[in-house]
């Protein structure tokens, strides 16, 4: 699995200050997507043990509220094994931190995912450009 971004101090993707991972790869390709560079599964860098160590170190602070998982689309089947393991380890080590995840798929399409048991808030559904939300803090791109 590759990723295109890792932010240790993100305030745009969930409540409070968060650690955010942007995975590479999305087959949905929503019109108007804000993150088109993430569509390719080979974009960015490989996710390694060192990447996970960076995430764990960043989460190990009282003022970090949680972990946000974005993309690309974290629910692409190619990501499931790596991300399920990562989320399990995050929840074991930091049970007080919330995990948020975004997907362009609906809940019905991801309800059997191995990621769901570790996610506290799922923001689901494809981005619809004509329903764009400009309000900061809405935590989703469109109102659908």
Residue ranges and their predicted role:
Residues 2-29:
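N-terminal pre-triad scaffold of radical SAM enzymes
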Residues 10-12, 67-68, 121:
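Short glycine- and Lys/Arg-enriched binding-loop motifs that mark or flank ligand-binding interfaces
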Residues 100-101, 123:
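A structural signal for short, well-ordered beta-strand segments and their strand-loop junctions
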Residues 116-144:
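Classical nucleotidyltransferase
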